[in-house]
């Protein structure tokens, strides 16, 4: 990575504004999954050990520029204290005199968590005044929030113009793993693209068709491709306006010598419910009033074989409606194949795929689970991420 990291700056005795991604799922004021907090620990611990005064900033949810009591970061501060085994001071604002006062009382190795940065309208507008107010709190800026790197916000991009700006360890790892996958992949290189809609994955498919040896399609978006081949898809998800695009993708794959894999059989249901009547049918035999909600057993075997023969697999998007157990087998089969393929480096592209490997208890068996759904998607589209671009070059 050609960006400076925390290793390249002397942080001893310095105030370090570290943007992290603590946007964790909450229910009734309690954190239901602390993966994102844990992911930032190596950088936080390093800064503490090096004698920095660590000032952490994050967003939580979508308060839209105003204070929402349920989205305060108090529960996050408590959980972080437990994980670090050290008290974390939490402020009620993210900048201003009270915050400066709290920072002035910090010793080397202390940790302070600012209030939710999205309580301020200037954050998402990337307001230079807010960015300057954040910068006034510190001597050095560290961005370890890969999950927010595709956003040009005051705490992810704006502040980097006013302070020395470097990457944290998580940011560094994400860019290195995803960067290598796109620029110098081990082969055979397979991409598995699922999820509900073609329109969300157009950029990824376009970019990856130039790089992969195998492209596997699943999830709701597959049925637009099935329709493009001239098959009837019953009541399955269809994006009518994307049929021609689907055709062009398949033609491009052929031109480039990319093996394009689509479902050969599917699990269909008579309604969208976990207790619906279901059956397995061949891809060209979907009944007119049924809908396909998962890939079938033959497809699972086919996809497993491709995965097992690959050296690198990037997976983004589930194979079916995995939230319902009746339609989770396809997604589970892909996750299991990745877990079993010991010679295959697996990169899970955040979002639903990450949630799926967690759900099936296979997260530990994956080589890299990206912490950023949207960010990893944009990275795989070949886009520059504003939060990364803003950091100092080596």
From Swiss-Prot:
Single GO term (MF): ATP binding
Annotated GO CC locations: cytosol
EC number: 2.7.2.3
Positions contributing to substrate binding: 21-23, 36, 59-62, 118, 151
Record field: catalytic activity: (2R)-3-phosphoglycerate + ATP = (2R)-3-phospho-glyceroyl phosphate + ADP
GO biological process: gluconeogenesis; glycolytic process
Keyword Cell inner membrane: no
Keywords: ATP-binding, Cytoplasm, Glycolysis, Kinase, Nucleotide-binding, Phosphoprotein, Transferase
InterPro entries the record matches: Phosphoglycerate_kinase, Phosphoglycerate_kinase_CS, Phosphoglycerate_kinase_N, Phosphoglycerate_kinase_sf
Main location: cytoplasm
Phosphoserine sites (modified residues): 183
Domain of life (superkingdom): Bacteria
Protein's pathway: Carbohydrate degradation; glycolysis; pyruvate from D-glyceraldehyde 3-phosphate: step 2/5
SUPFAM superfamilies listed in its UniProt record: Phosphoglycerate kinase (SSF53748)
Subcellular location: Cytoplasm
Family: Belongs to the phosphoglycerate kinase family.
HAMAP family per UniProt: Phosphoglyc_kinase
Protein name, as recorded: Phosphoglycerate kinase
Gene: pgk
